Amino acid sequence: MNNRVFDKTIKSLSAAMQMRQHRQNVISANVANAETPNYRAKKMDFEGALKRAIDLEDLGRMHVSHGDHFVMGQGAIGRVRPDIYDNPEINYTNDGNTVDLEKEMAALNENSIIYNAATKLINKKLAALKYVASNGGR
């Protein structure tokens, strides 16, 4: 995707879709462990990292707090890695588990909706490029 045809929008949408896949895995793990004693629900912060990567893409260099947060090289947008951590917003149950199944299912639904929206946007962008490529010389 280093070609100029694939602009910042496509790179950003692609990275957002990858983030949604990561988030799906995190939420699925939380749901799967809803009955596991002492399991701590995980949370993922990707939006902040994605925003920083998009902002820094044009600067040509990146400042990071930890070397593993970004992979340097062919552009920052598509190579951002999300931070996954124990969710501090959840209360413990009697067995020490912190999964709130209702919140996790709502997050799963929200994640699915946003993933589908990103998919539609990238498909429209690619359809426009296909149209221009096939009808540009007419």
Which residue stretches match the model-derived regions?
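Amphipathic alpha-helical polymerization modules
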Residues: 1-138
